[in-house]
Amino acid sequence: MASAPWPERVPRLLAPRLPSYPPPPPTVGLPSMEQEEAYLELYLDQCAAQDGLAPPRSPLFSPVVPYDMYILNASNPDTAFNSNPEVKETSGDFSSVDLSFLPDEVTQENKDQPVISKHETEENSESQSPQSRLPSPSEQDVGLGLNSSSLSNSHSQLHPGDTDSVQPSPEKPNSDSLSLASITPMTPMTPISECCGIVPQLQNIVSTVNLACKLDLKKIALHAKNAEYNPKRFAAVIMRIREPRTTALIFSSGKMVCTGAKSEEQSRLAARKYARVVQKLGFPAKFLDFKIQNMVGSCDVKFPIRLEGLVLTHQQFSSYEPELFPGLIYRMIKPRIVLLIFVSGKVVLTGAKVRAEIYEAFENIYPILKGFRKTT
């Protein structure tokens, strides 16, 4: 279709392919300003008409979008999580994956793993909501001790939609937790029955008591039997009795220390006997605040011990100076007991307030001593 002639001052590039309109009346010479304005208004009206008639999908007015780009639809949760149907179909098939860069052992393990079928994957995706597609706790708790075969077996036993199968049953122990427990370093422990045959024996008990009166030590030393007093050497009277076989230190302030008893009852009985001796000498002695301050026990583990290896392994608890003292000094934190360990297997425990602390300390140290037993 032939287009009408254009005015000379209207550029031809501004209106390509415009529809035809009636030609202007012929003029002689240059057009006037009114004619130019009329032509301009007519041109703008034609452009506005074309803008209103342009289709919304026109390639001229719509942004260019590549054909291979897939836009997610937020209103559809299925497309938001499973956007590409082709990917969902091939998600369970790994036969086409190139595994040549992996070692032969890993490749063989991958071949042995059971693969979930496409039908089970589709049913699982349809039955579960997008929020329930998050990884289960069993998938998150994968540790060091789990190999690929155990993971594949546990995954193949899960059925789609069965939420009870995810949690382990309490009747069957979890083999994965056992493998993790075997990796964790632990202090060597032995059953209590192994060390039940060895019971520490109490060798000495130190107790204190308050007689609650001032004492004349010279008078006590002169009139009492089996008593000695040397103020230049020690500022207390040293008194002994035969039953129980103990020794007492009596101070002028009225405080007394009783040592040498083999049990708590013997220590109390001996302290009361010393208080009775002081009363018979004319002092108003009482028996107040009796308390056991220290208990000493000893035992024999019946095997030699490598003290050099023990002090290297337990440096923060032990000290060993064979030039100064032949025994290893082990300071236990709980219970707060000090142990003297000798290479022959003899053990001395001291620092306890009650008998149970002696037994507990020996039960704790016996597995450690057994780990450093001399073989030759």
Curated annotation (Swiss-Prot):
Protein localization: Cytoplasm; Nucleus
Compositional bias per record (Basic and acidic residues), positions renumbered to this chain: 108-122
Region (Disordered) location: 103-184
InterPro entries: TBP, TBP_CS, TBP_dom_sf, TBP_eukaryotic
Low complexity: compositionally biased ranges: 126-159
Key words of the record: Cytoplasm, Developmental protein, DNA-binding, Nucleus, Transcription, Transcription regulation
Predominant cellular place of this UniProt entry's protein: cytoplasm
GO molecular function, a single term: RNA polymerase II general transcription initiation factor activity
Annotated GO CC locations: cytoplasm; nucleus
Family recorded in the similarity comment: Belongs to the TBP family.
Quaternary structure (record): Interacts with TAF3.
HAMAP family linked: TATA_bind_prot_arch (MF_00408)
Protein role: Transcription factor required in complex with TAF3 for the differentiation of myoblasts into myocytes. The complex replaces TFIID at specific promoters at an early stage in the differentiation process.
Protein name: TATA box-binding protein-like 2
Organism field: Pan troglodytes
Species classification: Eukaryota, Metazoa, Chordata, Craniata, Vertebrata
Gene name of the encoded protein: TBPL2
